[in-house]
Amino acid sequence: MTFLQNPHFRPGPATGHPMLDQHAARGAAELLAQVFDHPPTPLVSLREVAARCGVGAVHIKDEGARLGLKSFKSLGGAYAVIRLLLREASRQLGREVSVTELPRPASGSLALPAAGTHDLPAHPDVARVAQGMTFACATDGNHGQSVAAGARLVGARAVIFVHSAVTPQRRQAIARFGAEMRLVEGSYDDAVAESARQSAAQGWTLLSDTAWPGYTEVPTWVMQGYTAMVHEIAQQLDAPPTHVFLHAGVGGFAAAVATCLHSVYAPGPKVVIVEPRQAACLLASALAGARTKIPDGPPTLMAMLECYEPSLVAWDLLQPLATAFMAVDDADAVTAMKALALPQADAEVVVAGESGSAGTAGLLKACADPAIRAALGLDDSARVLLVNTESATDAARYEAALGHSAEAITRRRAGASAAGLLSKQSPA
């Protein structure tokens, strides 16, 4: 494990962003609610983890059930598809197009409805615009699912670029939405570059979740979609968090959630960014004092976080806002997966994938080190917030790491829910 107190830490008004504040979060949540009839994801009180860590409270926002895609990414890519279609349809039709003119899935889920199966179909003019649009992106797995599912929902085409380390199960999870799959040799960053080249050449709409100079608007829309979960958290927590551990790949999720939390709970919690040791590009950037691309490293079990260059927008927000950066090992992620999946209390069971457990891994490692505990103020008054960003998106990998199937763990939690043990943690 590597730990770095951020030498550039300087929170204040300059660390905010108007597209990622509490007002933007409410707007994102309201837009999504007009398209999807979907309840908030649960906020689970982890009493055993809190006792193990010696802190006052630990809560985890469980995004594993978000819109049927098993990941928080369904808030970002699909949200940006909707925003981009609304803008393009308004431009082509010469009038402001409302979200009420978009299709509404009959199931309230991005995953379940067959193409064209909606409670409310799209306005014919808007549907024609959508049919002429192609959305393209690179992915480690989850963002591509969200873009592909969002494109299918509105009737557009999707082309998804995956690199060679994306597992067959994750590729199939994207392809089921009718997306055209393009394989790129190399890393996620190579897939990002190829998706940008092909989009420019083909006239496609590039929908990346990472930003670079000259390309920031769309990734910020993706990040704005993520803030909808903060809008929910603010209604679910009884007291403001003092600390939040957020894992990062390119940093878009971490920057969006941290920035929005600081808007909701000014002056906001201490923010600790957690990355895989093999792909700690944000930690390297903090050490260098500038956004830094690191060399491709060996693969990590935390595959959704295997990125080697921070998003420009994310880095600009996190550089002054993060209290500290951490890098954890694959074994730490497995320890966290087990802590979440196998507590003594059924009501605290959380199915967290290898990447979804990384923030929890950071908390467990920090609390086990007296010097880090002291540096972060992790004492019995601390109220820690975590986010499980994904459930078992690759069932075989999950079972191999944990020794238990995701289905078996889910059944245990379902039993607690049926017994009414989750009623206070999972608002309707």
Regions found by a protein language model. Give the residues of each.
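PLP-dependent amino-acid enzyme catalytic core
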Residues: 1-428
